[in-house]
Amino acid sequence: MAHNEAVDVVLVGAGIMSATLAVLLKELDPGLKLEVVELMDSGAAESSNPWNNAGTGHAGLCELNYTPPAADGSIDIKKAVHINTQFEVSKQFWAFLARKGTFGSAKSFINPVPHLSFVQGENGISFLKTRFEAMSKHHAFSSMEYTEDKATLAEWMPLMMSGRAADEKIAATRMLNGTDVNFGALTNQLLNHLSSAPDTQIKYRSRVTGLTRKGAGWTVMVKDVNGGGTREIDAKFVFLGAGGAALPLLQMSGIEESKGFGGFPVSGQWLRCDNPEVVKHHQAKVYSQAAVGSPPMSVPHLDTRVVDGNKSLLFGPYAGFTTKFLKHGSFLDLPLSVRVANIKPMLAVARDNMDLTKYLVSEVMQSMEQRLESLRRFYPEAKAEDWRLEVAGQRVQIIKKDAKKGGVLQFGTELVSAQDGSLAALLGASPGASVTVSIMLELIERCFPEKTRTEWASKLNEIFPAREKILETDAQLYERVSTQNDEALELVEKKSQEQSFA
């Protein structure tokens, strides 16, 4: 066995989370020695891959499940506002890197694509109108447009209006400042940027086989998948950012904070169209409402995707079930994750989520014709020969202890960290990649509290002139920061002079 290497930071998984955290830490302390270890032979091979990622550029502009109606019919926009400001924080980091000049062009990973919400029927229209009235009063959504006019709708979403019944009651809202983000390209751009920094290694085809306490830090055992050799790395801090594999790695650590967590894997499928004659008629991300009783992951949307400069359309998601935690994982992932500490929450979730189980089974059993029927609700003239089924990435939803129910299924992400801040893991799924930077900032503040208050404070303020809370309330600051980010990311033509955020 090779002699132990010593580093400051080990990051497990070469996806968007680890890549973001690694680059951010090197900006804050260029002297840090860090290593990224990844099982696959490239970065962004799982959920960060553009064909695996369920939704991109989430900014709360069009996702109707972020603005649920209350019992009295009013709309709560808090979650949409929060996700919007989190996305603006992500844009601040990308803009900071783009301005450096050594990072490369932002056009390789972010493109302007309008975000639309689309509803059908009287109830849908009533909901969307109320939502529009509530959201357009907030500065983050002040440019939102609403229409029920068929001619206007035909301009906004021509593919979706052709062949539709003239008397069908429909409505839509539009935000022109939406984006499509290729998180695979962004991840690899971050990793390339990282690999040029001193004291930084990215090791592919490497499997973490052990994680044990060593003094104030950790010893990470890593097996070379190709050669079979094993080495040990001593690290002061370990981040488990391995997507669905983060849960078993967290369990391997044995930290008290990991007890009681379980995972519920959900796979996804998409219909994909690359026919340029179809694709050219749809330049938008259009989200609608999930069917009554369906989980939030089932919100249907028809998206323009830009990957490597080529446009495609994706429609879905169609959910599925497998016991794998990663697309390239093992069918034993779920059974091997069962522990004494999490079996009660997992059984409680199984008991209380029979509707979800039935939904997943029904999705798995769908024929191609049934999937096309769902698509034709959006695109009435869809032809079977233009679309093919693609398997998306794995999402592992969080199961956690609950005092009343025994266990609950949680949709979203959760940061789990050791009490001493020496180890952290990211569990869960949506909104995921779009709010990566906010999540990694939370991790840094939680695991390195002293440094964020002292030696890292000025650099953090330079990179992030405005954080989420102030962006939620200060309209002028929001406008200024957002405009400068958009210019740096080449989303709009440059108009404003560079100015202080003070």
Curated annotation (Swiss-Prot):
GO BP, one annotated term: tricarboxylic acid cycle
User: SUPFAM superfamilies in the record, alphabetically?
Assistant: FAD/NAD(P)-binding domain
Reaction catalysed by this chain? (S)-malate + a quinone = a quinol + oxaloacetate
- Keyword Hydrolase present in the record's keywords: the answer is no
Pfam family of this protein, just one? Mqo
* Gene3D superfamilies named among the record's database cross-references: FAD/NAD(P)-binding domain
Q: Among its keywords, does the record have Oxidoreductase?
A: yes
Q: Which UniProt keywords apply?
A: FAD, Flavoprotein, Oxidoreductase, Tricarboxylic acid cycle
Report what the protein is called.
Probable malate:quinone oxidoreductase
Q: Which organism is it from?
A: Pseudomonas syringae pv. tomato (strain ATCC BAA-871 / DC3000)
Gene name per UniProt: mqo
